[in-house]
UniProtKB/Swiss-Prot annotation:
Main EC class the enzyme belongs to: ligase
Record comment regarding domains: Consists of three domains; the N-terminal catalytic domain, the editing domain and the C-terminal C-Ala domain. The editing domain removes incorrectly charged amino acids, while the C-Ala domain, along with tRNA(Ala), serves as a bridge to cooperatively bring together the editing and aminoacylation centers thus stimulating deacylation of misacylated tRNAs.
SUPFAM superfamilies membership: Class II aaRS and biotin synthetases, Putative anticodon-binding domain of alanyl-tRNA synthetase (AlaRS), ThrRS/AlaRS common domain, Translation proteins
GO MF term set: alanine-tRNA ligase activity; aminoacyl-tRNA deacylase activity; ATP binding; catalytic activity, acting on a protein; transferase activity; tRNA binding; zinc ion binding
Cited function: Catalyzes the attachment of alanine to tRNA(Ala) in a two-step reaction: alanine is first activated by ATP to form Ala-AMP and then transferred to the acceptor end of tRNA(Ala). Also edits incorrectly charged Ser-tRNA(Ala) and Gly-tRNA(Ala) via its editing domain.
Alphabetically ordered keywords of this record: Aminoacyl-tRNA synthetase, ATP-binding, Cytoplasm, Ligase, Metal-binding, Nucleotide-binding, Protein biosynthesis, RNA-binding, tRNA-binding, Zinc
PROSITE patterns with a match to the protein in the record: AA_TRNA_LIGASE_II_ALA (PS50860)
Residues annotated for Zn(2+) binding in this entry: 566, 570, 668, 672
The species this protein was found in: Clostridium perfringens (strain 13 / Type A)
Protein name as annotated: Alanine--tRNA ligase
A Pfam family assignment: tRNA_SAD
Family: Belongs to the class-II aminoacyl-tRNA synthetase family.
Length: 879
């Protein structure tokens, strides 16, 4: 067989099926759209589910893709074996009611044996036990040797998930060994031994399984095939694992270079290198597709992968930041197939760098605490770390659970995961109760998401805010209805509408719908999971009926304000690029009638000067009264024209480009003003950080901007009145008063210090002796941590062989400190152990060295009991 690189294989597959009249689609982003059942795209057919289920019409009945996928179900095995990985590419060709078995089987054989040139005596085929149709096609339409076809049962060659569409499948296998297997038993044995590997699965979706377990023929039969690019690459390159194929090996070589480690010399180092290689690739693609590190959902998947790779870098001796340098190798090997990687390379590097820096801070503090837990366990001969301690590491210090488990496993220890999960559940319930429960009509089981896929609503609301239409669907959260009566709430679909459905960060329109028999207010307009325009309504008079003519009217004033804010968002985006740099990209947005919110990539808080420049630039462009122009064109034309595309969006072949004069040009389906002058005024309200490398600006326009400025002006007047000065002198007056307060605070601190300095002799009067060791305890009032340490140090210097424990109620918070003379340590004194027990009594925690420790607490009323506890602990230590 001729060697073929992974990039060549990808192109050959897609080109082959294009020659069979398939539409080639670019890979969908890893973040699923309108699919709450998936955290990340994990299969080639996953983003095409709406086409298979009939919720949406496919752009063509024949489609071929190479889909980016992430699977983390067996992440613990990644690195430990050379077969497991989290990122992979799935080659697929799909038919939605077009061709079926008699076409795909000979095509598959043609591609494998002719295009790829795989020897026929290295191939085996499996079919479902009683799929005679597939057997007949294999033996009549291809030249496969019939003795190389094996019939297998449901577990191997039938695809189904509960009830619904399902069907048999045929799989194609490659034999890495010598000689021919003759029986099913020999075939299965060779497969279990990894001598024979499956590399292409052709699923024939031809049945609908009902609740009783009956298999009924589908009217529309579909084809869903999947071939892992990495798997076929191992075959075509004559290697036996994914880390040896050309693209992945190049990334592995980069990992070796960055860690100064050599692959293949040390088993443990190989594990770390494979983890860095795989996870480095996955995090690059995840960030490119818009995922941000966080503590939940797909953001946590990203954080977990990144931190696991970072830790294995440390195990290889890496000091500091290095994972961001892996991006170059990923871009070099995948950039041609996924050009968005090249466009976002610098941004991806910065996000990884920020997250790795944060992790290095986390791991240092968390590791110290975890190792202290492990030391305690070893002293007590315990094998299981408590769930409460692991949860404290996770919740308080941000130390990943998986990292705790991995380190414990390396030490031969276990984690009480059941109690960890219990702690996690309790915390989530507390959070849920704190924010309150909320719901919105439109769950995936609701009738609103079961509307027939053939129903189409024409949107005609860019110019028209009022039009006549026909009701084609009515319903509520329980069922479809022929009529909705006064007082009832529900949803309504029409054949055309002027109502904009919530999308692209812009809220849906509101307004009213009238007919001969009644009137309803439209409270919102959204798209259901199938992309249909859904008007959420409340009938306020009479009734609305299915099939009747209605008049739809959008709230024009509200729409006008939304348009102002949406166009201003585009202008803000461009202004940020000009002021901060081209690395700025939209990360999210929200536009309603009152305000706009814009999230964007940037790595530091904006200075006042930068904010002023951005705001001024937007207002200057507003005052040019530039025409806002919209044009439809192909995606390639839009990109070539310089239009801004959002890198986590999946665009159709035809797109809408919105231009504000020669200042801003973006792909957008939203509603906008006719010219920039309609916006009137733009005012930034706030700027803040929302995640690593993501900033947020909130702003107002038009009348809302005037009201905001009026509010600010009134606040200035009120402040001037309180300070008894002119508005222009407010800053000077506040600065003077702040200086005066600072001087007074300094005087108070000096007085407190003098009081403390003379206190050591009084404190020593209460000294007691325990088995030859002196113990001094004292409770003080309003002494800060620094002064308390100074006092403890002075008392310690007056002891011959002893320990001092001091506690202070400082404004409702407890400060604790313990110090011991060096010779007392030989008698068993350990300040860290003492302070840990003492702190628990006042509702706090802490620790430290044998000769010095400190802690805090929140229950000052228990200080006396805490100092009694100090005496008990010292008595135990110096027996």
């Amino acid at each position: 067989m001729k060697f073929m690189g992974a990039n060549e294989l990808r192109e050959k597959y897609l080109s082959f099926f294009e020659s069979k009249d398939h539409l080639r689609l670019q890979s969908f982003p890893l973040v699923p759209k309108n699919d709450k059942s998936l955290l990340l795209i994990n299969a080639g057919m996953a983003p095409l589910k709406p086409y298979f289920t009939g919720l949406e019409e496919p752009p063509k009945r024949r489609i071929t893709t190479c889909q980016k996928c992430i699977r983390t179900g067996d992440i613990e095995n990644v690195g430990k074996t050379s077969r497991h990985g989290t990122f992979f590419e799935m080659l697929g060709n799909f038919s939605f009611g077009d061709y079926f078995k008699s076409e795909i089987i000979p095509w598959a054989w043609e591609f494998i044996t002719e295009t790829l040139g795989i020897p026929k005596d290295k191939l085996y085929v499996t079919i479902y036990l009683n799929d005679d149709e597939a057997y007949d096609i294999w033996t009549s339409k291809t030249d496969v040797d019939p003795s190389r076809i094996f019939r297998l049962g449901k577990d191997d060659n039938f695809w189904e998930i509960g009830v619904g569409p399902c069907g048999p499948c045929t799989e194609i296998h490659f034999d890495r060994g010598e000689g021919k297997v003759e029986t099913v038993e020999e075939f299965l044995e060779a497969s279990d031994a990894d001598r024979i590997v499956e590399f292409w699965n052709l699923v024939f979706t031809q049945f609908d399984k009902d609740e009783e377990g009956n298999y009924n023929e589908l009217a529309q039969k579909n084809i869903d095939t999947g071939m892992g690019l990495e798997r076929i690459a191992t075959i075509m390159q004559g290697v036996d694992n994914i880390f040896e194929i050309d693209t992945v090996k190049n990334i592995l070589n980069k990992a070796c270079e960055l860690t100064n480690a050599k692959y293949g010399e040390d088993k443990d180092k190989d594990v770390s290198l494979r983890i860095i290689t795989d996870h480095g690739k996955s995090v690059t693609f995840l960030i490119c597709d818009g995922v941000q590190p966080s503590n939940e959902g797909r953001g946590y998947v990203l954080r977990r992968l990144l931190r696991r790779a970072a830790r294995h870098g440390r195990l290889l001796g890496v000091k500091g930041i290095f994972l961001n340098e892996m991006v170059d190798a990923v871009v070099e090997n995948y950039g041609e197939a996924y050009p968005e990687l090249r466009e976002k390379a610098d941004y991806i590097k910065k996000i990884i760098k920020l997250e790795e820096e944060r992790f290095n801070e986390t791991i240092d503090s968390g590791m110290d605490i975890l190792m202290s837990y492990i030391s305690e366990m070893e002293e007590k001969n315990e094998k299981v770390l408590s769930g409460a301690k692991a949860f404290k590491l996770y919740d308080t210090y941000g130390f990943p659970l998986e990292l705790t488990q991995e380190i414990l496993e390396e030490k031969g220890l276990e984690l009480d995961i059941e109690n960890f999960n219990k702690e996690m559940k309790e915390q989530r319930e507390r959070a849920r109760n704190a924010r309150g429960e909320s719901s919105y009509m439109g769950s995936e089981e609701s009738p609103v998401n079961k509307v027939d896929a053939s129903i189409v609503t024409e949107f005609d609301g860019y110019v028209n805010l009022e039009l006549n239409s026909k009701v084609i669907v009515l319903g509520n959260n329980e069922e479809f209805k022929a009529e909705l009566k006064e007082g009832e709430e529900g949803f309504l679909l029409t054949d055309k509408t002027p109502f904009y459905a919530e999308m692209g960060g812009q809220v849906g329109d509101r307004g009213n719908i009238t007919s001969e028999t009644g009137m309803a207010i439209v409270t919102d307009c959204k798209k259901n999971v199938g992309g249909k325009f859904v008007h959420y309504i409340k009938v306020i008079e009479g009734s609305l009926k299915e099939g009747q003519e209605v008049k739809l009217s959008v709230d024009a004033s509200r729409r006008s304000n939304i348009c102002k804010n949406h166009t201003a968002t585009h202008m803000l985006h461009e202004a940020l690029k000009e002021v901060l740099g081209d690395h700025v990209n939209q990360s999210g947005s929200y536009v309603d009638e009152e305000r706009l919110r814009f999230d964007f990539t940037h790595f530091a808080a904006l200075t006042e000067e930068e904010l002023e420049k951005v705001e001024l630039l937007v207002n200057e462009k507003i005052m040019t009264v530039s025409v806002v122009d919209t044009k439809e064109m192909s995606l390639d034309e839009a990109r070539n024209s310089g239009a801004t595309c959002l890198f986590d969006e999946k665009y159709a072949e035809k797109v809408r480009v919105v231009s504000v004069g020669d200042f801003s040009k973006e792909l957008c389906g939203g509603t906008h003003v006719a010219n920039s002058g309609e916006i009137g005024l733009f005012k930034i309200v706030s700027e803040s950080g929302v995640a690593a490398g993501i900033r947020r600006i909130e702003a107002v326009t038009g009348i809302s901007a005037l009201k905001f400025m009026e509010l600010k002006n009134n606040m200035l007047k009120e402040a001037a009145s309180m300070l008894k000065c002119n508005e222009k002198d407010i800053a000077k007056r506040i600065a003077a008063q702040a200086h005066e307060l600072k001087e007074k605070d300094k005087e108070i601190a000096e007085l407190k210090a003098k009081l403390v300095q003379g206190a050591e002799d009084d404190i020593l009067k209460d000294k007691v002796e325990i088995n030859g060791v002196e113990l001094v305890t004292a409770e003080l009032k309003d002494v800060d941590g620094n002064s308390l340490r100074d006092l403890a140090d002075k008392v310690r210097n007056k002891l011959n062989n002893g320990i001092v424990v001091l506690a202070s109620d400082n404004g409702g918070k407890v400060n604790l400190v313990a110090m011991a003379t060096k010779n007392s340590l030989a008698n068993g004194v350990h300040c860290g152990k003492v302070i840990k027990e003492v702190a628990a009594v006042v509702g706090g925690g802490g620790g430290g060295r044998p000769d010095m420790a400190q802690a805090g607490g929140k229950n000052p009323e228990n200080i006396a009991k805490a100092l009694e506890k100090a005496k008990e602990v010292v008595e135990l230590l110096v027996k």
